[in-house]
Amino acid sequence: MFPEQQKEEFVSVWVRDPRIQKEDFWHSYIDYEICIHTNSMCFTMKTSCVRRRYREFVWLRQRLQSNALLVQLPELPSKNLFFNMNNRQHVDQRRQGLEDFLRKVLQNALLLSDSSLHLFLQSHLNSEDIEACVSGQTKYSVEEAIHKFALMNRRFPEEDEEGKKENDIDYDSESSSSGLGHSSDDSSSHGCKVNTAPQES
């Protein structure tokens, strides 16, 4: 008998559906939906979506770099002083750059084991709460934060809508940043260790 053929693992990520969000009367920003589909043992739930803004990506890159000093991290799209959120070309160039960044990050096994990355991709927590959770300063664990968000957000976008939405921007949306349906990273039980130890600042 032949040994059972192992399935090749994959992690697919899309950054899509940019939306203008109102911060206050004078200030707005754009956030992007990050969707993941995977069969990787590092993830328990195989599909996830969350909304993040550019400055959260900047924080994530800094966080990952501080936790993996010897890893050469991919670059983010540069911060353009003349960035115009009403310019579709500007928005789509940034969206594509953010997607390329995440795709490269998710190909690195060391970065994929970082709890900060999992919480960024699979929870509603902001950067301060992610840092607190990873360093053990919250009542909930990394896994609990992700599972709670997964229970609150079960819907995942239809794949056949991806092509329509990927490059569209909703200029009238004032909805809050919320995810749709999330996966968890109970990866310690699958041999993919997630770093939850406190980090030195």
Curated annotation (Swiss-Prot):
GO terms for biological process: bone mineralization involved in bone maturation; bone resorption; calcium ion homeostasis; cellular homeostasis; cellular response to leukemia inhibitory factor; cilium assembly; endocytosis; endosome organization. Residues 10-127 form the PX domain. It is found in: Cytoplasm; Endosome membrane; Cytoplasm, Cytoskeleton, Microtubule organizing center, Centrosome. One of its GO terms (cellular component) is apical cytoplasm. Residues 8-125 are annotated as: Required for interaction with ATP6V1D. It is a peripheral membrane protein. Its main location: cytoplasm. SMART domains: PX. Signal peptide: none annotated. Pfam families: PX. InterPro entries: PX_dom, PX_dom_sf, SNX10/11. Residues 156-201 are annotated as: Disordered. Gene3D superfamilies: Phox-like domain (3.30.1520.10). One of its GO terms (molecular function) is 1-phosphatidylinositol binding. A 1,2-diacyl-sn-glycero-3-phospho-(1D-myo-inositol-3-phosphate) binds at residues 53, 79, 94. It comes from the Eukaryota. Keywords: Cilium biogenesis/degradation, Cytoplasm, Cytoskeleton, Disease variant, Endosome, Lipid-binding, Membrane, Osteopetrosis, Protein transport, Transport. Probable phosphoinositide-binding protein involved in protein sorting and membrane trafficking in endosomes. Plays a role in cilium biogenesis through regulation of the transport and the localization of proteins to the cilium. Required for the localization to the cilium of V-ATPase subunit ATP6V1D and ATP6V0D1, and RAB8A. Involved in osteoclast differentiation and therefore bone resorption. Interacts with ATP6V1D; may play a role in ciliogenesis. Belongs to the sorting nexin family. It is linked to Osteopetrosis, autosomal recessive 8: A rare genetic disease characterized by abnormally dense bone, due to defective resorption of immature bone. Osteopetrosis occurs in two forms: a severe autosomal recessive form occurring in utero, infancy, or childhood, and a benign autosomal dominant form occurring in adolescence or adulthood. Recessive osteopetrosis commonly manifests in early infancy with macrocephaly, feeding difficulties, evolving blindness and deafness, bone marrow failure, severe anemia, and hepatosplenomegaly. The PX domain mediates interaction with membranes enriched in phosphatidylinositol 3-phosphate. This is Sorting nexin-10. The gene is SNX10.
